[in-house]
Swiss-Prot record:
Pfam families: RraA-like. It catalyses: 4-hydroxy-4-methyl-2-oxoglutarate = 2 pyruvate; oxaloacetate + H(+) = pyruvate + CO2. It comes from the Bacteria. It comes from Corynebacterium glutamicum (strain ATCC 13032 / DSM 20300 / JCM 1318 / BCRC 11384 / CCUG 27702 / LMG 3730 / NBRC 12168 / NCIMB 10025 / NRRL B-2784 / 534). Keywords: Lyase, Metal-binding. Its EC number is 4.1.3.17, 4.1.1.112. This is Putative 4-hydroxy-4-methyl-2-oxoglutarate aldolase. Its cofactor is a divalent metal cation. The keyword RNA-binding does not apply. The keyword Metal-binding applies.
Length: 166
């Protein structure tokens, strides 16, 4: 028996449901993907101006997963471009949240794939494979914990321990 994916709940509605304890990200990300609402189980990666590890992660099948990428808020180089976003989409990921920059934003904006980032930069990142996977990353006053759940839309980002039912 296949379990269906949890229903998307708008982040503003989640705050109303959860109340004052809602884990809302303070960082103001831009919606740059074609899917402006996305959600899923969190996978994390910390990488500074190097995207080889995150490319490897997005090459893995993860239906409905969301990769949270902590690039230490650097917009000096892009961590995600159209090829890497396409890999994620093709492997079932619902989207990425990039604490850094992306490139190829016009193409990514046409994909049915969620992408929130601080901004854009056409400069490529290095590809040495440095970084850490499945570690707690703290962005915008909240912790993104691997295995927890994230909801993202045009109002912001909410993290919960598990999917919320309406």
């Amino acid at each position: 028996m296949t379990q269906s994916a949890p229903e998307f709940i708008a982040t503003a509605d989640l705050v109303d449901i959860i109340g004052d304890n809602a884990q809302s990200c303070d960082t103001q990300f831009q919606n740059l993907g074609g899917a402006t609402e996305f959600h899923g189980i969190i996978t994390t990666v910390k990488c500074f101006q190097d995207n080889a590890l995150l490319k490897s992660i997005l090459s893995e099948d993860n239906p409905g997963g969301v990769l949270v990428i902590d690039g230490d808020a650097s917009v000096h180089t892009a961590l995600v471009g159209d090829i890497i976003a396409g890999l994620g989409k093709d492997h079932g990921w619902s989207g990425v949240i990039v604490n850094g920059a992306i490139r190829d934003s016009a193409v990514i904006g046409t994909m049915t794939f969620g992408c929130k980032a601080l901004g854009t930069n056409p400069r490529k990142s290095t590809k040495t494979g440095s970084g850490e996977r499945d570690v707690v990353v703290s962005i915008g006053g909240i912790d993104f914990i691997p295995g927890h759940y994230v909801y993202a839309d045009s109002d912001g980002i909410i993290v919960t321990e598990a999917p919320i039912k309406q």
